[in-house]
């Protein structure tokens, strides 16, 4: 992901543009927050959802619920477009809270899964948002920068670039399971059983990981289709 002069960034519209070099991450984690190149800040959105004055009473109620449950981020990301279909907005918000805050995974583990999903889904906006969340949760920029982009994403690339940087066998198992499911749309028996063993022999934890992958793939498709820009 790191080049010697410039890094080529492919945006959501399919065009490419040259961005300044992202400096090689230092071992000093205090500099981590300054090393990510935001790729989708200038996107012109296709649709950001209904305007407040045009919302129905049901949409306003759902909007208020989203704002109450997401005081720091509000209607950013896919939530605006979702509001155009109230039942989808309501259900998506509830599922999002469940997979983000209602699982047995640590925040660091969850953010690792989300960032892998965003990279594989070619969603710069999702990655831009969750780089900051991942750093807060304890991931380093070295780990985040090592995650392969969509066109080079594979279980082999993850094994070479990311796995050596992870802290423990539990994280490595989660990353391997996530990468294989994203890359192959299924996982082999060996991966399933080894991941289950690393996670306390609980199938339910694999349900949680798979649900996070599914939800953030869904979110990535929304962000990509409607060209929702990033925010720093």
Positions of predicted regions on the chain:
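N-terminal export/membrane-targeting signals
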Residues: 1-4
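Hydrophobic alpha-helical segments
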Residues: 7-8, 13-232
């Amino acid at each position: 992901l790191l080049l010697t002069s410039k890094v080529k960034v492919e945006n959501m519209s399919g065009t490419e543009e040259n961005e300044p070099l992202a400096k090689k991450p230092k071992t000093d984690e205090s500099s981590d927050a300054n090393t990510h190149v935001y790729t989708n800040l200038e996107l012109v959105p296709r649709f950001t959802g209904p305007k407040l004055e045009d919302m129905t009473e049901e949409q306003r109620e759902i909007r208020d619920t989203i704002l109450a449950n997401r005081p720091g981020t509000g209607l950013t990301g896919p939530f605006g477009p979702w509001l155009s279909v109230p039942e989808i907005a309501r259900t998506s918000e509830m599922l999002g809270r469940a997979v983000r805050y209602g699982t047995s995974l640590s925040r660091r583990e969850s953010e690792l899964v989300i960032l892998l999903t965003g990279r594989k889904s070619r969603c710069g906006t999702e990655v831009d948002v969750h780089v900051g969340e991942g750093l807060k949760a304890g991931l380093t920029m070295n780990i985040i920068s090592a995650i392969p982009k969509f066109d080079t994403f594979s279980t082999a690339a993850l094994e070479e670039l990311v796995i050596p940087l992870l802290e423990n066998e539990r994280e490595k198992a989660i990353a391997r399971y996530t990468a294989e499911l994203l890359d192959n749309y299924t996982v082999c028996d060996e991966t399933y059983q080894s991941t289950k063993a690393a996670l306390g022999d609980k199938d339910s934890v694999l349900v949680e990981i798979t649900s996070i992958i599914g939800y953030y793939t869904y979110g990535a498709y929304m962000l990509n289709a409607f060209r929702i820009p990033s925010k720093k």
